[in-house]
A protein has these predicted regions:
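Phosphate/adenylate-binding glycine loop and adjacent helical scaffold
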Residues: 174, 186, 303-415
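Extracellular carbohydrate recognition and processing domains
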Residues: 184-213
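Beta-strand-rich interaction surfaces with strong enrichment in secreted/lumenal proteins
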Residues: 54, 128-129, 149-153, 187-194, ...
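Aromatic (Trp/Tyr/Phe) and Gly/Pro-enriched flexible surface segments
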Residues: 59-137
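Surface-exposed ligand/attachment interfaces on beta-rich extracellular proteins
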Residues: 13-17, 56, 77-84, 196, ...
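Intrinsic low-complexity, repeat-rich intrinsically disordered segments enriched
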Residues: 1-62, 275-283
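Extra-cytoplasmic beta-strand recognition segments
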Residues: 69, 137-177, 203-211, 271-273, ...
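Extracellular polysaccharide-targeting segments
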Residues: 50-74, 211-215, 226-307, 411-414
Length: 415
């Protein structure tokens, strides 16, 4: 018997399996449940799969930089932190303490979940159990507005923010993760748990149709993990369901653990990811070279701890690397310049270990009295004016080196 059978529903018997002969054309509006298609299946119209279409398909999903904690240009270990704000170890990770007596060590650690090589470890070294109302400590990453435009925040097409990361600690803890819109003073927070094992935290923050991000190279949004907070930030109701105008008391959970409650306390972090999506996707790994290039937009260091001076005979440190050449314009002033490998976010500030500067001129080494006087750098070139007490030969090119393995100069355009 041949012909056409029209039906509104096909239902399998028993196992609920329906077999359609090969070559049969079906006009299907909805397939529910968990269907399995075997063989070669051709779909002649659009197919909507929420678990795929709910997020970006393809690479470059992750907005965060150095999420796998690969790059540590400044240092792989710093102690006695907690008294000032800044970037100290992992690139793009900023520590922001306020009025706390707690202190900690930050290190690059080899403990990591499967598929990762590194994590950022914080280790409390001085406890602070008497928490003042205005105290806080959080780690953060700031993001340029021009890198957030695809979230369409402040429009009717606004997209959700999905944050994920891996954490562990010495004991159970509860901390608060916050997204803070700096352009419009809006925020939203959610809590997460830490155990003694590596776990992946997955947090979905809803879209915000109010307040667009500025399209520029300034900081528009801060991602923060609050590890310590006083009642000025914990006494309200945690703003966790939708974006709202920032109220200090609603930013941190009242159940937030204090990282400074004991010198036994540790906190490990890696696998940071931020994507425009309604689902969580696997971490997007990038090569070390890619990650280093992204980090160098904000910070570049030359010298320690990456100084690789080698003596061909003893393999001990020698002052053999010429970092740049200088042109003198009088007997005690020189200017050196070199192109940067990556254009920086803004005109950078410059710092230098003045005590370790060595100027070499006409066969003479000048090891003291040298200071960085003027930074004339641009986003694409370093231009450094060195003042010296030495009497230089103003007709010769002068080389800039260091007289110690701890010598360095750096350029910072951090947010």
């Amino acid at each position: 018997m041949t012909g056409i059978v029209k039906t509104d529903q096909i239902q399998g018997a028993g196992s609920s399996t329906v077999t359609i002969p090969s070559g049969t054309a079906l006009n299907v509006t909805t397939v529910s449940g968990t269907p399995t298609f075997s063989g070669a299946s051709t779909f002649s119209s659009d197919v909507t799969l929420p678990s795929i279409n709910g997020g970006q398909i393809g690479g470059r999903r992750n907005v965060f930089i150095n999420g796998a904690m690969q790059v540590f240009q400044r240092s792989t270990s710093e102690s006695s932190l907690g008294g000032s704000t800044g970037y100290f170890t992992a690139d793009r990770i900023r520590f922001k303490p306020n009025s706390t007596a707690g202190r900690f060590t930050s290190t690059k650690d080899s403990s990591a979940p499967n598929g990762f090589a590194n994590s950022l470890k914080l280790d409390c070294t001085t406890a602070d159990t008497s928490i003042g109302a205005g105290e806080y400590f959080f780690l953060s990453q700031k993001i340029e507005g021009q890198d957030l435009q695809h979230f369409a925040k402040g429009t009717s097409d606004a997209k959700p923010f999905t944050v994920s990361f891996y954490v562990k600690g010495n004991a159970s803890a509860t901390y608060t993760c916050e997204l803070y819109d700096e352009d419009n003073t809006r925020q939203i927070s959610k809590t997460f748990s830490v155990t003694t094992n590596w776990t992946r935290v997955e947090l979905l923050f809803p879209a915000d149709t109010t307040g667009a991000f500025d399209n520029d190279n300034n900081s528009s949004m801060t991602f923060a993990i609050w590890l310590h907070a006083g009642t000025n930030y914990t006494s309200g109701t945690l703003n966790s369901s939708s974006w709202a105008s920032a109220t200090a008391a609603n930013r941190v959970s009242s159940s937030n653990t204090s990282f400074f409650d004991s010198t036994d306390r540790t906190f490990f972090l890696t696998g940071l990811q931020l994507e425009t999506s309604s689902i969580v996707t696997p971490f997007e790994h990038r090569t070390f070279g890619e990650e280093l290039t992204l980090c160098r937009r904000y910070y570049q260091r030359y010298g320690y701890p990456f100084t690789a001076f080698r003596n061909s005979t003893t393999y001990s440190w020698v002052d053999a690397t010429i970092w740049f050449l200088c042109l003198p314009f009088d007997a005690d002033d020189v200017v050196g310049s070199h192109a940067l490998p990556v254009e920086m976010r803004a005109i950078p500030t410059a710092t230098m270990t003045d005590a370790y500067i060595r100027l070499q001129n006409n066969g003479q080494n000048y090891n003291s009295g040298n200071t960085l006087q003027v930074n004339g750098s641009s986003t694409s070139h370093a231009s450094l004016h060195i003042d010296t007490s030495a009497g230089l030969n103003a007709t010769n090119v002068i080389s800039f080196t260091f007289n110690n393995s701890n010598g360095y100069y750096d350029l910072s355009a951090e947010l």
